[in-house]
Amino acid sequence: MVVFLSKNVRSLLSIFKKKGQKQDEQRKLTVHYTASQHYQENVFIEGSRPKYLEDLHTEAQEGLKILQQEEEDTSSKERNESLENDSTSGHSIISVSTASAVSTRPVLTRQGSTFKPLNPVKRLDKSKRRSRRTTIMGIPQQVQRELDMARGTMLQQLPNRGHDSEDDSSGTVVLQTIDGDLPSVNHEGARVHLQNIEVLQASRDEDLLLNHIHSVYQDELNRKLGLGACPTQRPKSLAVPGMTTYSFLQEPQGPVMSISPQATYLSKIIPNAVLPAAIDIIEINHDHNRCSASTASKGSMASASPSSSRSGSGTNQAPPTTSPSRSNSQSSETIVSNSSTISSKGKCLPTFDADSAKDISVLIPKDMSVSSSSSWKSSEGKGTNHRLNPREYGDAGDNVRNSHSFSRSLSVMKTKLPPAPPQRTYSLHHENMQRQREQGDIQDPKDVAPNNNEQTNRDISSTKENHQSAKNKKSSVHSLELRSDFHTTVKSSPLSPDQVFTGRHARSGNSSPQKTRECGENFDRTLSPSSGYSSQSGTPTHSPKEVSPSSPGKRRVKPSKPERVCAKTSPVVSVSSSLTSLSSVISDTAHQDIQTNTTSSEPLKFSPPLTTVKNKVTPTHQTIALRTLFNIPPPPKVKAPSPPPPETWVQNKQTLELLCGPGPNIHKLESLISKTQNKNSMQINEQVIPKTQTTEETKTENTVVKELTKSASPQVHKQMMVEPPDVRHTEKSILHNELKSPETLAKVNQIPHTQDEKTIEDQKDRWSQTLPTTNVPSIIVDQSMLSQTNSIEKTKAATVSSNENQRNCIVTDIVNRISVQTLNIEVPEVNGVSPPPSPPPEHHPPPPPIKKMSDMSVSIPPSEKEEQKQVEQVTFPESSWPPPPPPMEESTELMFEEQDELDFPPPPPSFIHEPMSEISDDFHEESCEEVSIKLLSTNVSDMDSSPEQDSERHTILPKRIVQNSVEVRQQDKSSDSVSEFLEDQAEIENTNVASTIISSHLPDKNLHEKETLVSTSIPLAPPLPVEEQSTINFRKQLSFVDKDNRSKELLCRHKSTPIPKEDANIPLVTPSLLQMVRLRSVNVGEDQVNNDSKPSTEPTTNEDHSISSQVTPQKPIRRSLTLKSNSPAKSSSASSAVPSMCLQEAIRMKTAAMSCSGVPAMLNLRSSSGSSATSPVPSPKSPDGCDLLMSPASTASFIFSKSTKRVVIETPTSPDVQASLKQSLAAEIMQVSDQAKTMITNGTKKPIKVPPPVAKKPVHGSNPPNKMENATQDKTEILTNKQIMRVDVNGQSDQVHPAGQRAQSLGNQEQASKEAFAMNMSICA
């Protein structure tokens, strides 16, 4: 294996390629270096390598040495010559030097050696590349040359004036690299320590550049000013002979800069070069002495001179003529500022006397930069702007024009927008830069203030001071500071130039604004060094223009050039764009500050006033700019972004809590508490539980609860808000556990229910007041309230431990009696509660607690369930908050689903999308929550109403709970029967509307009136209490199916019909449908009333009658209202009608299991749970009758249902069919009512087997119950939301018949449903 070490691989290749040696050597190589050798010879060991290898190696070594030497020579020459001729012939010289170095180097010519001497041309190319590599890292050579030449020439002149020639070389400008390497103190021209470039630029190059710049500036200024002062030979472009054009061609850097991308965007050719604070390259030192040149960090250059270092040349502080235009080009203000002492710093500069230079140095240590020095030089030669010499005018005009031309050329060169990172980088520097700017501005005011009267002298002295201070201070003002100063300077300097041009400082305030506008606009372009990248407005463009108007009168500052609009707009946007953008941002900030300050200091437009303005602007920039930049806008008061669609986060309790977070605001709790108190006061009157006993406890408890709520709620809310969903779930679990714990029960008992009600209602009032405003917090508030109430109840429960035991026993008994109902009800409540969270946060707060409660209720023992009921009741009063009434059905569905789908709540369309339905759902859920809260409060007040007797309370509590459940059942069973079928109808037809209406009415009326009843059942706000009780159990069992089905159904409804759920449920509310619904409502109401009143309680029948009477005419909305008003009763009746619900649930479960049709099963389940199992089946039909069948939502529901059966949707062809369908529905409702009555008569939660309902509907194809039962076993025809879905258990086919045709099949289907119901009841029995 041959190891050939040589930089020139070709020499190695040539070894083998030589004709004569090729074969022999190849053979030798093959022989000597076969892989078979036991060892590979080390070619570098002399003894082990053959002679040809030795020769080759020697050749390679020698060639390498030669190459190294040549490279060294080339690099040294390149440095020297490139820096000498850096502006123009640096690269060409480098190339020549490389060639010369190559040629001067002895060329190896070894006989038979494969090494070939370096090709001088190639070497030249390599040296060029190397040169490029060396120069790329620093400020672009153009910029360096410009800075060096401008500054060097200026400084040379200045040293002649004896002001900044501390360096041995008068024109020495020390450009430091970020590396911090400083050129030797004595350097001619800019010394950039980038890599190897540490050579002095020839003064001739600087002179050339300066002459070019002066001519450009003068010509530009003349054009701007309309002065003919040096109109002769104006460079057509900024291209400086050796620097821009030649360098551009030869320098890879190009005229802009090959620095950091930011630097590239922020820098321009000398006059326009703006070195942003973010530039990595160098810090421009005013001083010739390197001592004052502090290593320029990215912001150092800018700090060195705000505007001039920004411009990268002495733009800010440039002499009146050169500096103004240069400043203008570099930083919008510089041009003007140079003409009229750039801002406070540059102001002195225009009078480029030794004194003024000194003053400027003092005043403009930051503003001054190398380019500013160049400007000084030019202005020095030209005279001070303040002196208003004709030459000054010409110079100022030339400067302005030159700056404009430069800015144009630079802008042309810099067409790109600065990268966003610079903005961040710059933004990071904002504070420091602003501080430095403050310091610099403060310094400037000191220096500039004196200049007010002695501006010319001060300008000279300022220039000197500027250089000196640039040397000494070199105050590293970040480009922001520089720009703020720069902008200030621009503002003032345009005035100053006007003053200079006008010769009137006073008038320059007025004319200067206009002129400043011209200059500002122009120099805004000139500012394009950075602005050129951000559409020339850059920072300088935007801020200078604004700044200069600011100094005349901020009025113009705001109206930036439309061209600059992007830059002005970019002040914020540009920030990210680059330092240019940053400058624009800063300039905007400074502009604003300047506007604020300059407005007051407009009279200061004169150079001295400008100084004052600058001083003012500096504090303003610091204060306002820093405030503007660093004052992070307060986080939005909104607790959280609008919650994602309910399906996303409603499903997740944690997410719900997180999104809806318990309102950390105590005020919300207080408002809710006050509201709860108000509602409780109403409820107290309405509640069956004696509240006389609870008065004292209520007061005490209200105080305690309020205190706890106030003290704990904020924390709890904050915790809920801050804590992740898991923590909230944990809190909920703790809450539930606490509620479950006998202590909690005892506490709840102990807590006067009235008191709790009042407290909770007060909280609800407060919360409701707050919640509507902040929905998400309200949920958290509910949770926190629940947790607080639970804690309070716990505390009180601890006091009544013995009572807890008794009460636990009683509660256990009561729960055993009501456990199914409570559980079912709780589940709906939970679902109802949790769904709202998924909607807008307003209604969310209540749901999460209920979810917890419902989850707990599902898993908690009866006593715990009862407590949970109470908690849920408390939560429902919270729901009672005045959120927009959520649609009942969605609440119901969501409740159902929420228990089952707590993890993944049904995807109800977000309330925003379906405001009516979702709001209704939310409101309904909130209503349910309110009801549950009120009921809980009632229960608590009932339990605690007799604080004297905790055991009595326990006894009373169970009794009351039982009574409440019975009363609620009695009151609501009628409403339940009716409301169940209404719920089905409402769910089907107007689930959303019904939910909305019901929830709206229910929270206000029924929550108060039937709070106690609802507390027992904790009915879902939607009219699905009974329905959902059974459905809840069923859904718990079929939770996944129901969840999926319901979510699918909801999704289908929402998707298929973007209309509110009510619309989706009731796509078409036809008269026939309404009639069917009414008939069903009447039949079901009567039947259910009969059934409910017979088995359970007569009050239920009465309520059912009232409900059915209400339901009969009920339109979807009215039904919602009725359901709303009766939903507590419904839930109570659901609790009391648990047996029927159980039967219904069993039927539904069996039907769902048999049908496994996702949406149809869910619909049936919902309907049946609402309407005693059979009623719900028809109710989907009648309410939705044709509509659901016809509605795309229903169709989508069927299509998307999980059932594998085919769904054949048949639309009723004729009103006759629809009428027959209505009749069949009525008959079916009657049958279902009979079944429900039978179940209720059994009065056991466990549904007693009811003989299969006899199908007596006038529906053709009706089968006897047995047949239907059998058919149900084989086929379960499920009417879902206005559609009859024949679910083939075998998965063969499901026929969905719209109202018309469905009427015919309704008999069979309803009979089948009834038979299925009977079968389920028998199964349950």
Curated annotation (Swiss-Prot):
Residues 53-85 form a coiled coil. The keyword Coiled coil applies. GO terms for biological process: cell differentiation. Residues 335-344, 400-412, 450-460, 935-948, 1088-1100, 1302-1311 have a biased composition (Polar residues). Residues 428-447, 515-524 have a biased composition (Basic and acidic residues). The keyword Ubl conjugation does not apply. Pfam families: NHS. Able to directly activate the TNF-NFkappaB signaling pathway. This is NHS-like protein 3. It comes from Danio rerio (Zebrafish).
